[in-house]
């Protein structure tokens, strides 16, 4: 053990040798990675026939829906959507411009009667609900929103005092006033309420917020909060803890604190299911809650938002995820042919994120190589453990090293180049007993794996290098885990998944190429979804019973993703 006390830190000579071998191994893996890249570039280079040698998904392995979707033109079909639901996502919300463009081209926005959203999705839902068209919406979202939402007077110097006094860095007043002006242009009143909006337009709007005092999500809607102003609800819904100060709102003599709705429910695809927000007279609170003996059952979330299968197709939802993020819908959404990412633009943000992605790919390759090398090494050790005991002596290790079944490549991956049998034995025999026992071997393999896993997770995990990283990571953790409580496998069939590529939650300062990239992703992802939706509807209409079961089973695949 090295002495960690005092000025002088002593190091175990074995640790020095171990470090040297790890460095040698890293150099070897780097060389292999470069060779892999060169090989892939060679595959991508077209030959005389124009082929690249890269395998594409062939028609023979496409399922019925995919084959049908490839022939669909969404403009030739009608769709049953009446409700739009937008997930929160910060700067990723720029992609909604592309999604709305797709819907407007097909005339679908005009048939929508109910809008809902969280955070950036709350802004989108509200602007559409009060009557902003595509061109107006794009002009609004094309602004530098960072100058609007980040309004701390003294910038970073305001951080500590604002946290202590207001529980957040940015007061959000500039956004509150700006959004009020947007509402006034369409509704004639900055503080138009949910009730006033409903009476004037006949449209319903739902904004999801988090009530900190009651520790639950709340649904701001004409039925639940008729006298609340829309801009107040949107201001609540964008209040990412730490980045923005929360909103304090008094109702019925009780003051509660509200923050970002995405903290608990970032994708409210369920909000228009069931009776809770239904404006039908039979679903009024007076009618539903008069049976007090059944009150607990009625207020259970599964009862309030119980999905009637005949109404499922009325709701269309949108989820956002950057290429580096996980999402429970992502795996299945990205199976849809046509949603694949375009090349990342050569912008400042694009270059940074592209480097991170390359580092991640490199770590994945290293992981695969080392796992294979470890497997090969253990097999050959087992074969040459002649006395079949629980230890390996030097002679047995030497025989393993010389075996044709233990390749030079695997040896160099585990021990680096030019490592002798004696060096390897000294490294493995940590206790200097003259034999390598199972625990010593396991520790070596564990050390190898930990090194790679930590490097790999370093590109997957969220770095918490400061105050804002801390709060962004908390929200991401909540979203990833809490989302499972509000969605089900059947929601896949009414969800558009939009991969925003290199643009993440807080990347508000985008260049024109970044913005165009995200908008294009929103457009093509929506169009692709509509092709699949129409294809499935056509197939179900004309299919026999066995084919109907196969088509319906495509959605149930998500159930395994939800449970994992």
Name what the model sees in each region.
Residues 2-118, 126-564:
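Patatin-like phospholipase
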């Amino acid at each position: 053990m090295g002495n960690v006390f005092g000025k002088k830190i002593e190091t175990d000579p074995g640790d020095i040798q171990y470090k040297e071998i790890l460095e040698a191994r890293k150099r070897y893996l780097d060389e292999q990675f470069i060779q892999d890249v060169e090989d892939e570039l060679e595959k991508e280079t077209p030959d005389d026939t124009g082929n690249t040698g890269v395998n594409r998904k062939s028609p023979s392995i496409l399922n019925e829906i995919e084959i049908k979707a490839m022939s669909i033109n969404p403009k030739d079909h009608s769709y049953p959507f009446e409700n739009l639901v937008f997930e929160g996502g910060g700067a990723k919300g720029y992609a909604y411009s592309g999604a709305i463009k797709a819907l407007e081209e097909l005339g679908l926005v005009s048939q929508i009667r109910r809008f809902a959203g969280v955070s950036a999705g709350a802004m989108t839902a509200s602007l559409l609900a009060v009557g902003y068209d595509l061109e107006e919406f794009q002009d609004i979202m094309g602004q530098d929103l960072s100058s609007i939402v980040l309004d701390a007077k003294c910038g970073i110097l305001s951080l500590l005092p604002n946290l202590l006094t207001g529980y957040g860095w940015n007061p959000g007043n500039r956004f509150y006033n700006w959004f009020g002006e947007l509402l006034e242009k369409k509704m004639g009143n900055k503080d138009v309420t949910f009730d006033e909006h409903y009476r004037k337009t006949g449209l319903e709007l739902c904004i999801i917020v988090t009530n900190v005092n009651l520790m639950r999500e709340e649904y701001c809607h004409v039925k639940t909060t008729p006298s609340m102003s829309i801009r107040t609800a949107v201001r609540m819904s964008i209040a990412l803890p730490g980045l923005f100060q929360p909103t304090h709102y008094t109702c019925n003599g009780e003051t509660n604190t509200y923050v970002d709705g995405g903290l608990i429910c970032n994708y409210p695809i369920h909000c228009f299911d069931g009776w809770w927000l239904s404006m039908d007279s039979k679903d009024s609170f007076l009618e539903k809650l008069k049976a007090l003996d059944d009150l607990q059952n009625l207020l259970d979330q599964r009862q309030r938002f119980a999905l009637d299968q005949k109404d499922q197709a009325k709701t269309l939802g949108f989820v956002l995820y950057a290429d580096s993020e996980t999402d429970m819908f992502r795996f299945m959404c990205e199976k849809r042919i046509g949603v694949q990412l375009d090349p990342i633009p050569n912008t400042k943000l694009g270059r940074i994120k592209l480097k991170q992605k390359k580092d991640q790919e490199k770590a994945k390759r290293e992981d695969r190589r080392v796992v294979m090398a470890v497997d090969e090494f253990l097999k050959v050790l087992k074969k040459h453990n002649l006395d079949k005991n629980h230890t390996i002596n030097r002679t047995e290790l030497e025989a393993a090293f010389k075996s044709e079944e233990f390749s030079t490549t695997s040896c160099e991956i585990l021990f680096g180049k030019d490592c002798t049998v004696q060096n390897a034995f000294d490294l493995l025999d940590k206790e200097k007993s003259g034999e390598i026992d199972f625990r010593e071997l396991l520790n070596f393999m564990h050390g190898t794996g930990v090194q790679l896993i930590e490097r790999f997770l370093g590109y997957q995990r969220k770095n918490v290098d400061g105050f804002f990283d801390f709060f962004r990571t908390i929200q991401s953790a909540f979203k990833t885990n809490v989302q499972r409580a509000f969605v089900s496998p059947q929601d896949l069939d009414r969800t558009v998944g939009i991969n925003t590529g290199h643009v993440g939650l807080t990347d508000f300062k985008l260049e024109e190429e970044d913005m165009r990239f995200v908008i294009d992703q929103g457009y093509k992802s929506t169009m692709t979804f509509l092709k699949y939706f129409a294809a499935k509807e056509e197939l179900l209409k004309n299919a026999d019973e066995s084919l109907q079961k196969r088509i319906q089973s495509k959605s149930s695949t998500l159930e395994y993703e939800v449970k994992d």
